[in-house]
């Protein structure tokens, strides 16, 4: 019996957004994988956190956790979003007339390296501040980072009609609300769980506020990028993911008390 399309899309999202192989006999479909990217983001975050917990049990120092978390994220995703950040930074620096050309160039420019360096330093600083609370912050930041793609795809024109992310864009798009259903279902479930359990190392109300506030950078950052670029491309989708993740880690480091 053929698998439902949503399960095929979920399998496709797993393959596209991570370096992992197909784990089931389900044939992947890629037409509507973007709707599942926030859930894949949560899964990536959970994998990162699981490794961190294991290393903590093996007496690894807390100070090493931010570096390991970032390294794991880069490995699991194959650096696909970070590559988009660097290309987008190079495109913005090149100016409107050469923006697309610079983003397509496989060579990394100075602006791309600077953007990557600043982003990594900010993430490391936020993770050091969060300490053990990174176990909660990383999956949520990963969720909202990828949710920004759904907003960007739905609300802004696609710059490169021949790009590799064309299938993520308008052709198979069902509208912002429809494509957001998996994300809203997950958020509702998560908030319900948090309301009904007691977490000793964290303020549950503050955590819920942080989760809800994530909607703002997930909308604002794609909007700012679209204004500078005139729309979005696969690269700027990746840049949105990385920048929103960083913004969320900073927000959590401010509103969550030190562990």
Swiss-Prot record:
<dbReference type="InterPro" id="IPR003805">
    <property type="entry name" value="CobS"/>
</dbReference>
<feature type="transmembrane region" description="Helical">
    <location>
        <begin position="238"/>
        <end position="258"/>
    </location>
</feature>
<keyword id="KW-1133">Transmembrane helix</keyword>
<comment type="function">
    <text>Joins adenosylcobinamide-GDP and alpha-ribazole to generate adenosylcobalamin (Ado-cobalamin). Also synthesizes adenosylcobalamin 5'-phosphate from adenosylcobinamide-GDP and alpha-ribazole 5'-phosphate.</text>
</comment>
<keyword id="KW-1003">Cell membrane</keyword>
<protein>
    <recommendedName>
        <fullName>Adenosylcobinamide-GDP ribazoletransferase</fullName>
        <ecNumber>2.7.8.26</ecNumber>
    </recommendedName>
</protein>
<keyword id="KW-0169">Cobalamin biosynthesis</keyword>
<dbReference type="GO" id="GO:0008818">
    <property type="term" value="F:cobalamin 5'-phosphate synthase activity"/>
</dbReference>
<comment type="pathway">
    <text>Cofactor biosynthesis; adenosylcobalamin biosynthesis; adenosylcobalamin from cob(II)yrinate a,c-diamide: step 7/7.</text>
</comment>
<keyword id="KW-0808">Transferase</keyword>
<keyword id="KW-0812">Transmembrane</keyword>
<dbReference type="GO" id="GO:0005886">
    <property type="term" value="C:plasma membrane"/>
</dbReference>
<keyword id="KW-0997">Cell inner membrane</keyword>
<feature type="transmembrane region" description="Helical">
    <location>
        <begin position="36"/>
        <end position="56"/>
    </location>
</feature>
<feature type="transmembrane region" description="Helical">
    <location>
        <begin position="175"/>
        <end position="195"/>
    </location>
</feature>
<keyword id="KW-0472">Membrane</keyword>
<feature type="transmembrane region" description="Helical">
    <location>
        <begin position="108"/>
        <end position="128"/>
    </location>
</feature>
<keyword id="KW-0460">Magnesium</keyword>
<dbReference type="GO" id="GO:0009236">
    <property type="term" value="P:cobalamin biosynthetic process"/>
</dbReference>
<dbReference type="GO" id="GO:0051073">
    <property type="term" value="F:adenosylcobinamide-GDP ribazoletransferase activity"/>
</dbReference>
<feature type="transmembrane region" description="Helical">
    <location>
        <begin position="133"/>
        <end position="153"/>
    </location>
</feature>
<feature type="transmembrane region" description="Helical">
    <location>
        <begin position="65"/>
        <end position="85"/>
    </location>
</feature>
<feature type="transmembrane region" description="Helical">
    <location>
        <begin position="201"/>
        <end position="221"/>
    </location>
</feature>
<comment type="similarity">
    <text>Belongs to the CobS family.</text>
</comment>
<dbReference type="Pfam" id="PF02654">
    <property type="entry name" value="CobS"/>
</dbReference>
């Amino acid at each position: 019996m053929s698998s439902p399309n949503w399960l095929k899309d979920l399998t496709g999202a797993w393959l596209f957004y991570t370096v992992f192989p197909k784990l089931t006999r389900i044939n992947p479909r890629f037409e509507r994988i973007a709707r599942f990217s926030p859930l894949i983001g949560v899964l990536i975050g959970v994998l990162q956190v699981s490794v961190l917990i294991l290393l903590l049990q093996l007496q690894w120092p807390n100070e090493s956790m931010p570096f390991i978390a970032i390294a794991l994220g880069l490995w699991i995703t194959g650096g696909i979003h970070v590559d988009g950040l660097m290309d987008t930074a190079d495109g913005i620096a090149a100016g409107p007339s050469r923006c697309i050309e610079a983003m397509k160039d496989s060579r990394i420019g100075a602006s791309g390296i600077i953007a990557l360096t600043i982003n990594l330093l900010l993430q490391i600083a936020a993770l050091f501040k969060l300490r053990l609370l990174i176990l909660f912050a990383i999956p949520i930041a990963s969720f909202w980072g990828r949710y920004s793609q759904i907003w960007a795809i739905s609300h802004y024109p696609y710059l490169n009609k021949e790009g590799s992310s064309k299938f993520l864009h308008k052709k198979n798009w069902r509208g912002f609300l429809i494509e957001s259903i998996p994300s809203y279902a997950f958020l509702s479930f998560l908030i319900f769980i948090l309301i009904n359990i007691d977490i000793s190392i964290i303020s549950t109300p503050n955590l819920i506020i942080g989760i809800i506030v994530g909607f703002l950078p997930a909308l604002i950052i794609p909007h700012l990028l679209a204004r500078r670029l005139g729309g979005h491309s696969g690269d700027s989708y990746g840049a949105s993911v990385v920048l929103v993740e960083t913004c969320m880690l900073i927000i959590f480091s401010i509103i969550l008390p030190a562990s």
